[in-house]
Amino acid sequence: MKFGERKTMEKIRVLTAGDSALLIQFEQRIGEDVNRRISATVKLLKMQQIEGIVDMIPAYASLLVQYNPLVIRYEEIYKRVSAIVKMDTKVESMEKKVWEIPVLYGGEQGPDFSYVAEHAGISGEELIRLHSEKDYLVYMLGFLPGFTYLGGLEEKLHTPRLENPRVKIPAGSVGIGGSQTGVYPVDSPGGWQLIGRTPVKMYDPEKQDPILVQAGEYIHFYPITDSEYARISEAVASGNYSVQWHKEG
């Protein structure tokens, strides 16, 4: 699959995925237009309130619809889902939700910051500017609870993963792996190049909705200082910090 934009969508297929799920396959490439089509399909399915659907899991170019076969028969769910994917979703008019995520770049929080800048042939200041000037689309969640696979990374910042992955990466670490960037939501092993860290909790099991950002939404990183990092960390720990977001479109 390749990143890219096209004006037309190839035929969408609805496939059987075991005895309690359907897999909707969209055009098999990675692109914002494909992702918008997936998000629009999720929205339509929710609006239909089809009894028996228990979960929907979006990926780069597909949507897994899980259902309870004791509540709705295969023939019925297949018919209704197939009808929905044929509908005009008007994806161009969808709103864009953007989360503002603070990041302390470099230093102890970004041990690979200098390497990424050197690999790109740019200064540290330019690395921060390039990484923090875009809104990144959350194509999907995976690998870990709340781990965001983000698209739109400046090509100059594309950096190979570590040859020897780290045994433990602190929660909140912001990394680059190949053509993608993302945030580690919990302490975990990992092989991405770490350029900074956010004090924000991307995953909080104590909350009713533990995952902060959902697939189809956007993340905008903005640089902060050491003192701001310490202040926000304290506010997060005491439960007095709310991550800012806005809508566009």
Regions found by a protein language model. Name each.
Residues 2-249:
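Glycine-rich active-site loops that engage anionic ligands at enzyme catalytic sites
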